[in-house]
């Protein structure tokens, strides 16, 4: 779309100004210089566009510079809030900005395009009650910098909030009292989704992440398939964030499509901050027809599954005097009961192992967590504030599986840490999980999983801000069931690689991606070019991974996103697979929607077995 407008402006500037087109001998010096600074093209375009009113209006309205304005470093640091530590909070004022026009750095800006003005009028701003019920701070309390930072992060994590800033305003007549101004900016919460899987199937959906500004979510999707029944199905959901200010999230849904037929209801409360004393959740799901236990499960059944799934957990913070000087440290004890009963399922495998077994599982965990956050931007988002976690989460889990095919014990150790190095330019996350079920005959369904995630500093190349992302993952299955295999077509493998033949009990993957955030936006849509290289190897558990054949994918792509809208990121990707199996083409192109990647936040959780996926 951007290049269409560029071409229109160039053609219009030539025709409306009366200038002719002449062909001259190439100036190699100018070409080389332009390659070094691609923004010169837009600067030149702006000059051409300014020659008449029509093209000047198109350029100013549609193509704009999105370089970040100078950000007050005090607003970005913990030290800013620390200067007001223990001051009494006098008043809390909440100001909600329009979606289009102003931002947190200049609240006086206004929307200029008619479509932006219309969207501002149609949108229902988050009510003051919704914002206040998500506040941990109260008038009359002593100001705690950690609480302020955590509260900002909590509000930013809400699906209908774009960004938030807490501004401290000292009182001139009383130095011991401060007022707090909270600036919030919503996203346009109404959205559409859709996709075409092939000529025979597709879907279209509609949703609202902030119904009437009260923080409720509702959505429905029509899913069609001409070859499978029901030919036209639907799935709907309804959820409430933070029911009555208790920080309990409620969700319920029903679906009847060719993929599955089920209904569910859930309540969840997390350890949202280190000071959280308790957390837990309840979930009930009745699945009448499905090929998986969970939609993110890697194991699928060739025959329909019919089952009842119940799950409940509770966790509590332990105050045992361990590390009392660290306010970001949290030690938790949690327990879980998970029940599943099948009414229809496939037969056991040749070894009489049954992945889809009737089971009641009891789990307990002891977790040690330390977490804090650094603010940055242009990591996974496109200019809004992002909270980068640093710290660790270590957990020890024990369990007992009351299984119809034989009772067994379970245990795992999970270690993870993430930090920033060299005054915040680089981020490195590592994790190691080792676990297994235990029977009298030995261990089964064991796993060793090692991950490394690296994010580079934001650097400039050809006057464009860029980052590099590197992920390394090594997973080994130990005595896994025959039906359980690792593949290369999920988020840990090779993107766009749809092979069903490349699988095994052991996997090694390396993903390298370079992202180039563009300095220009069109109608508030930001974009980023990216290049990638994915390498994956799978094989049997009893053989060296380096003796197996490798698969790879490399290519380029474009991501387009507006942080003012609730829509997912639009992605165009072209890939080449040099060493591909027969069920994968050598060239792959895709246009799809992708969800925003999230950081691992070192938040204590309910105990559950390590996933082999």
Task: Describe each PLM feature range.
Residues 2, 16-443, 454-613:
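Immediate N-terminus of the mature polypeptide
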Residues 2-8:
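Sec-dependent signal peptide recognition
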Residues 8-17:
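Hydrophobic h-region of N-terminal signal peptides that target proteins for export
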């Amino acid at each position: 779309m951007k290049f269409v407008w560029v071409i229109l402006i160039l053609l219009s500037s030539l025709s409306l100004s009366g200038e002719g087109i002449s062909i001259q001998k190439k100036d190699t010096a100018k070409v080389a210089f332009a390659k070094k600074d691609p923004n010169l093209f837009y600067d030149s375009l702006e000059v051409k566009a300014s020659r008449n009113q029509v093209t000047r209006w198109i350029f100013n309205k549609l193509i704009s510079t999105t370089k970040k304005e100078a950000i007050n470093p005090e607003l970005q640091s913990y030290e800013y809030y620390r200067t007001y530590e223990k001051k009494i909070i006098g008043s809390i004022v909440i100001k909600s900005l329009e979606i289009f026009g102003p931002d947190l750095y200049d609240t006086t800006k206004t929307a200029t395009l008619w479509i932006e003005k219309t969207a501002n009028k149609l949108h229902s701003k988050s009510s003051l009650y919704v914002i206040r019920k998500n506040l941990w701070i109260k008038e009359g309390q002593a100001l705690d910098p950690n609480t302020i930072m955590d509260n900002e992060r909590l509000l930013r994590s809400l699906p209908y909030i774009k960004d938030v800033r807490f501004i401290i305003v000292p009182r001139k007549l009383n130095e011991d009292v401060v007022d707090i101004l909270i600036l919030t900016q919503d996203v346009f919460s109404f959205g559409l989704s859709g996709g075409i899987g092939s000529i025979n199937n597709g879907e279209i959906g509609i949703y609202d992440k902030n119904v009437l500004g009260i923080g409720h979510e509702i959505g429905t999707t029509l899913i069609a398939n001409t070859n499978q029944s029901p030919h036209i199905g639907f799935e709907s959901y309804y959820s409430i964030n933070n029911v009555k200010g208790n920080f309990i999230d409620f969700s319920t849904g029903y679906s009847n499509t060719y993929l599955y037929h089920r209904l569910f209801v859930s309540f969840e409360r997390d350890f949202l901050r280190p000071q959280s004393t308790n957390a837990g959740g309840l979930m009930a799901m009745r699945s009448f027809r499905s090929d998986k236990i969970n939609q993110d499960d890697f194991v699928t059944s060739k025959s329909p599954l019919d089952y009842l799934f119940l799950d409940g957990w509770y966790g509590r913070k332990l105050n045992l005097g361990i590390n009392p000087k660290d306010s970001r440290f949290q030690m938790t004890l949690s327990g879980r009961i998970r029940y599943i009963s099948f009414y229809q399922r496939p037969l056991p495998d040749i070894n009489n192992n049954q992945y889809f077994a009737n089971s009641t599982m009891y789990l307990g965990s002891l977790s040690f967590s330390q977490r804090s956050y650094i603010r940055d931007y242009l990591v996974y988002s496109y200019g809004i504030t992002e909270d980068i976690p640093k710290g660790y989460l270590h957990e020890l889990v024990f369990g007992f599986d009351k299984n119809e095919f034989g009772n067994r014990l379970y245990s795992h150790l999970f270690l993870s840490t993430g930090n920033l190095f060299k005054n915040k330019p680089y981020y490195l996350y590592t994790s190691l999980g080792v676990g297994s079920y235990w029977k009298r005959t030995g261990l089964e369904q064991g796993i060793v999983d090692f991950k490394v995630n690296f994010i580079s500093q934001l650097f400039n190349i050809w006057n464009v801000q860029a980052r590099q992302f590197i992920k390394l993952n090594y997973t080994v299955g130990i005595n896994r069931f025959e039906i359980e295999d690792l593949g290369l077509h999920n988020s840990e493998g090779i993107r766009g690689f749809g092979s069903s033949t490349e699988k095994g009990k052991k996997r090694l993957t390396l993903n390298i991606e370079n992202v180039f955030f563009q300095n220009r936006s069109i109608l508030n849509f930001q974009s980023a070019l990216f290049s990638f290289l994915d390498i994956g190897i799978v094989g049997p558990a009893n053989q060296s991974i380096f003796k197996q054949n490798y698969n790879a994918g490399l290519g380029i792509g474009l991501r387009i996103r507006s942080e003012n809208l609730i829509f997912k990121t639009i992605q165009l990707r072209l890939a080449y697979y040099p060493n591909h199996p027969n069920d994968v083409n050598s060239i792959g192109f895709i246009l799809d929607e992708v969800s925003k990647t999230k950081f691992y936040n070192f938040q204590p959780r309910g105990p559950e077995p390590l996933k082999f996926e």
